[in-house]
From Swiss-Prot:
UniProt keyword annotation of DNA repair present: no
Coiled-coil stretches: none
Membrane topology according to the record: Multi-pass membrane protein
TM annotation in the entry: 576-596, 611-631, 645-665, 688-708, 736-756, 768-788, 797-817
Localization terms from the record: Cell membrane
Protein name: Taste receptor type 1 member 3
Cellular component terms (Gene Ontology): Golgi apparatus; membrane; plasma membrane; sweet taste receptor complex
GO molecular function, one term: sweet taste receptor activity
Amino acid sequence: MPGLAILGLSLAAFLELGMGSSLCLSQQFKAQGDYILGGLFPLGTTEEATLNQRTQPNGILCTRFSPLGLFLAMAMKMAVEEINNGSALLPGLRLGYDLFDTCSEPVVTMKPSLMFMAKVGSQSIAAYCNYTQYQPRVLAVIGPHSSELALITGKFFSFFLMPQVSYSASMDRLSDRETFPSFFRTVPSDRVQLQAVVTLLQNFSWNWVAALGSDDDYGREGLSIFSGLANSRGICIAHEGLVPQHDTSGQQLGKVVDVLRQVNQSKVQVVVLFASARAVYSLFSYSILHDLSPKVWVASESWLTSDLVMTLPNIARVGTVLGFLQRGALLPEFSHYVETRLALAADPTFCASLKAELDLEERVMGPRCSQCDYIMLQNLSSGLMQNLSAGQLHHQIFATYAAVYSVAQALHNTLQCNVSHCHTSEPVQPWQLLENMYNMSFRARDLTLQFDAKGSVDMEYDLKMWVWQSPTPVLHTVGTFNGTLQLQHSKMYWPGNQVPVSQCSRQCKDGQVRRVKGFHSCCYDCVDCKAGSYRKHPDDFTCTPCGKDQWSPEKSTTCLPRRPKFLAWGEPAVLSLLLLLCLVLGLTLAALGLFVHYWDSPLVQASGGSLFCFGLICLGLFCLSVLLFPGRPRSASCLAQQPMAHLPLTGCLSTLFLQAAEIFVESELPLSWANWLCSYLRGPWAWLVVLLATLVEAALCAWYLMAFPPEVVTDWQVLPTEVLEHCRMRSWVSLGLVHITNAVLAFLCFLGTFLVQSQPGRYNRARGLTFAMLAYFIIWVSFVPLLANVQVAYQPAVQMGAILFCALGILATFHLPKCYVLLWLPELNTQEFFLGRSPKEASDGNSGSSEATRGHSE
């Protein structure tokens, strides 16, 4: 495929003066407008000998033509014309442009840069103490192409806070906002590209590589960044060197040969070549000449698409070439636009219509691009089509196109434009435009771009591979990079269909670490990690011990977490107990509601009235205490579990004790004594008994908390792969402390009711209390051995079950039968049945209640 070098660097790409008719292409590099944009493009190059022999600060003649620079300039022209022809960004305004050739040399670049900063209508930069109101000839500058030039112009324009948007300068140093506060670019920093390169090396396990850079700022900085990134990713650089720029001197030739010799001696198969196109041209020329063994060359963006390199004779002998290329939106109409402009440049009528006299800039600086007016349009047009179809130019063309749109968007924001007009009452200074460019978003075709804090844009990269088609290669996309690398292995071509291996030592297996031998960390032996340790990273040199809360088998690559083990809310046992809680609590609330509804009934009054309801409330609180047992143990929950369970139970049992005492008194003592004692057991003194019992239990709980406080324990020994967390009981004595009061109350209740003989024809309250206390003792006596033998992790579930079944036993044997009478046997809800006397007898104080009761029964 004919490349751009055939068009731009050989005699076939341009004609010397006098060969063919003159064009007026250079006269199209300026257009008037309300706001002028400066442009710096590599329209030509100069002979190196001319620069070496320069002894005076005179002008430099650019004799060779660069088609790439022309295409980039055309991209800027097309973008400006699009903006002017539309109304979305700058309605009612026109952008102008003033484009100059940099000749790819700093000396040449400074001349138009000085002209851009000259005061409007003059050719000089005035000296002021304050440049706030200074109005230069241009509002912003697009370019230059190379980082070397941008380092110079960036500092110069930053002094005046002149916005500068480069379409290709990618050096990371340009991201320094203190040095280059007004510099922006529509390409990512080289650091991003090198991160992609390091990711590519890691993907193919190429950890033994050579790194070469051009002997200039671009190459040296690239090598420095790559070296740091490679070291942090475990990639060893066997050899690092600088390649001099293309020179025919013997000294430079010796340096190139020495670089090639050291690369060969390092026995690497992969070389990262971060260099300018001219340095790569020099390196590959001698590599082909000296028959260097083929390598995998990882290219920087600066030379991956360079025709200077791609058209070298026998270039296929260098090996495989891979590199990342910034992705950009396609501009399908660009080819037609360039062809139209080139055709107009050859049209005498059109050329005659252009202004014939020299403008101010040309009088000072000479023609903008004299060599542009003597090119062969047919070769240039065909070369453009071929390079665009091969994907070698569109990313640079789009970057230039986007740079213009970024400035237009900033001007749009500064002028507060709407769909119909812009506010142009006052002139816009460059520094005002700059204020709107920081972190600004803008659109270029279908892409939304944004300047980051360092003035760069974040764009996706395509991974390109040279595929050989005689005589020159073409670029195939074989992957993408946007923070992560995506490869299309089926599209990659390798010698012998095998991916080259570039390693000093084989990769260690999983669970093995490296024992370095020699000086390079990539040369090592592999050693297994023992149990209890693991290999943290593939490039580790020592096994990392597992933490106390972790474990690992032998030859492990990770430590498995020892999951905390406790009675979780979602475990089946807990869910079952929670369902039981809902049942018991629901029955308790239903009983309480029923007794409140029938408050004045004989049954409720005979059961103790308010004391009975208080006992039910305590029973409900006793049930709710089970909610303290599931879940991850905490100090507060551990301390609260036993007191919050047994204090409500004491309140409940104390009310039952009062009823048991009343039953005992009524049955075993003379009537006169019984009436006197019952008045105390039912009156305010009854609450004193409840209070005293509760205070005794509270005192025992306080003793329990102070003398034997439970604590949250993390047990690492019980389970091999889990860590047990539980509330540890200090001793069995502590458990007995909180049960003393309740056990005594229950025992007294049992004695007071078990020995009592029920009277026929009356409700047998003693039987319900007897069975309730039996249920209490059976459950809590069974609880002790079960708690002692069950796995520690499930001890809270045992306590929950004991609490709920205890509550259910009391409820089912004592309270629910009374609810049954209230709902389904209302005819028994009488004073005779529950108190053993009629209303009349009660009022007369008659004690012959037994006969009345027997009469009711008959």
